[in-house]
């Protein structure tokens, strides 16, 4: 009789503990994250070989829908590298924050969007999601932004692809 009573207590407790442990794992399911963006660069302070570049623009992406973004980037013009951060804001105000490292240089590829002119750069940014708000609170993931940017017209455009934890899963 005592064994039956113990199993009546231990089995539900074990199920409860397993369910609690499964919730954080479910919140970490990665889903595809991709889209397109366009914007305008604005050169800031230049302390050779580093130039500060601020970018603002818009785009459309999975889980974000239509969004706007602001980017701050410190570019080493000699090495063709950079580091920075982006604040991505969905139409409803939910947001994602990322940090990135970048590399880039001249390219012979055709322009990816109008307004780049004849001379532009190829830029690859590797992003890590560092936080978010709303349905992106607690978000994690990483993705790559591949874009082109004109040092003459200051236009930029490109695409991104990678993964993000399932939006809203942490709630």
Give the residues covered by each predicted segment.
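Cleavable N-terminal signal peptides
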Residues: 14-15, 25
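Bacterial N-terminal signal peptides that target proteins for export
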Residues: 2-13
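Accessible peptide chain termini
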Residues: 1-2, 143
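Sec/Tat signal peptide C-region and signal peptidase I cleavage site
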Residues: 21-27
């Amino acid at each position: 009789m005592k064994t039956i009573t113990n199993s009546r207590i231990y089995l539900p407790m074990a199920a409860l503990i397993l369910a609690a442990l499964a919730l954080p794992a479910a919140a970490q399911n990665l889903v595809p994250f991709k889209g397109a963006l366009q914007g305008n660069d604005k050169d800031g302070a230049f302390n050779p070989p580093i130039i500060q570049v601020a970018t603002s623009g818009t785009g459309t992406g999975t889980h974000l829908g239509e969004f706007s973004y602001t980017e701050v980037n410190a570019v080493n013009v000699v090495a063709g590298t950079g580091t920075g951060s982006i604040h991505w804001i969905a139409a409803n105000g939910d947001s994602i924050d990322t940090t990135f490292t970048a590399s880039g240089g001249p390219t012979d590829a055709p322009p990816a969007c109008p307004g780049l002119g004849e001379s532009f750069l190829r830029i690859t940014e590797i992003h890590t999601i560092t936080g978010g708000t709303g349905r992106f609170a607690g978000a994690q993931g990483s993705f790559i932004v591949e874009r082109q940017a004109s040092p003459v017209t200051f236009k930029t455009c490109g695409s991104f692809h990678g993964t993000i934890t399932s939006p809203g899963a942490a709630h």
